[in-house]
């Protein structure tokens, strides 16, 4: 289901900015590693807390770690190993867009997620 039917970039951006949380979850798709893709028969899955991902772009390129937190409002994920030090000297997780990561290992503890994979299979 498309969020908007307009072709104007400003309206596309506005629709993404104002999208409700249940539709924002669709923006969290990340590609799977080639091994997982063959195993599950799916190319992309939404990133969830507990998944192991590899960062493909940015300063933390090549870092592999578990997803610690998922922020639906900001459309960002937080990964172990992708940290920086803030002005107070505390270590904080660096926000990363889900499209810039590749899922290396999937947390299959949720039965609903298994149903999603079965539904999406090629």
From Swiss-Prot:
It comes from Pyrobaculum arsenaticum (strain DSM 13514 / JCM 11321 / PZ6). Belongs to the universal ribosomal protein uL24 family. One of its GO terms (molecular function) is structural constituent of ribosome. One of its GO terms (biological process) is translation. It comes from the Archaea. One of its GO terms (cellular component) is large ribosomal subunit. PANTHER family: 60S RIBOSOMAL PROTEIN L26 FAMILY MEMBER. One of two assembly initiator proteins, it binds directly to the 5'-end of the 23S rRNA, where it nucleates assembly of the 50S subunit. Located at the polypeptide exit tunnel on the outside of the subunit. Part of the 50S ribosomal subunit. Keywords: Ribonucleoprotein, Ribosomal protein, RNA-binding, rRNA-binding. PROSITE patterns: RIBOSOMAL_L24. Gene3D superfamilies: 2.30.30.30. SUPFAM superfamilies: Translation proteins SH3-like domain (SSF50104). This is Large ribosomal subunit protein uL24.
